[in-house]
């Protein structure tokens, strides 16, 4: 797979390492951060859980290898298309790479949260929301990658760093994090952290299911015609 041979260079290695590093930083200074957040947002309980969840989602959004994975095939795309497998199976393999190399590193900061956050109903829902976001990010990135594939690049950096699809996926991930945190600080805190996280995870999974269905049907057809 072209993604494995090219995409996982220094750029993606650094992005993957950001998640475990953030977990180590949480163990080191997480207690201080949680105390500070609780002091600043005294009247808005659960902010520590939601904002730390937001931080992990924002970092995970930087690991966008699924987005350029189709474009990185370049003129050798015909090799993937000529394999005795369905187009959807090729796309599914790209999704699995993104999920494995994002969800597994994300378990490090999530596990570290369990040591610094109080054990409440919100804690397991932080895990659920982060993993739901990672699935959403992978499906969104691959959807953009298929819809805006560029197979005529002259430098491997073009589909990785100079692609509109990558830009949309990256800034879309950050926008998601901003809206997620902003809604909680605005009105969501009235629901409580657990209820808010549960609703956010459910909505995220619903949108992910729609993107997944598009990839499996129209996305696979479009990939076969590139």
Where are these regions (language model features)?
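Membrane-interfacial helix-loop-helix connectors in multipass membrane proteins
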Residues: 28-50, 109-130, 153-160, 188-196
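Hydrophobic alpha-helical transmembrane segments of multi-pass membrane transport/permease proteins
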Residues: 10-32, 52-57
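Long, hydrophobic alpha-helical segments
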Residues: 47-65
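Alpha-helical transmembrane segments of multi-pass membrane transporters/translocases
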Residues: 133-137, 173-220
């Amino acid at each position: 797979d072209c993604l494995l041979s090219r995409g996982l260079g220094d750029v993606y290695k650094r992005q993957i390492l950001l998640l475990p590093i953030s977990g180590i930083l949480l163990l080191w200074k997480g207690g201080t951060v949680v105390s500070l957040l609780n002091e600043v947002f005294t009247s808005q309980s659960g902010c520590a859980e939601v904002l730390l969840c937001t931080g992990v989602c924002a970092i995970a959004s930087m690991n966008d290898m699924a987005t350029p994975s189709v474009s990185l095939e370049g003129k050798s795309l015909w090799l993937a298309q000529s394999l005795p497998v369905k187009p959807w199976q090729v796309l599914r393999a790209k999704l699995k790479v993104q999920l494995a190399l994002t969800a597994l590193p994300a378990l490090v900061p999530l596990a570290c949260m369990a040591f610094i956050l109080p054990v409440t109903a919100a804690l397991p829902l932080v895990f659920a929301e982060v993993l739901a976001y990672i699935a959403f990010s992978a499906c969104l990135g691959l959807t953009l990658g298929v819809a805006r594939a560029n197979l005529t690049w002259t430098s491997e950096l073009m589909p990785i760093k100079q692609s509109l699809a990558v830009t949309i996926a990256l800034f879309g991930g950050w926008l998601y994090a901003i809206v997620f945190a902003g809604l909680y600080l605005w009105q969501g805190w009235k629901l409580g952290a657990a209820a808010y996280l549960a609703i956010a995870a459910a909505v995220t999974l619903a949108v992910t299911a729609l993107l997944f269905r598009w990839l499996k049907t129209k996305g696979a057809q479009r990939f076969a015609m590139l």
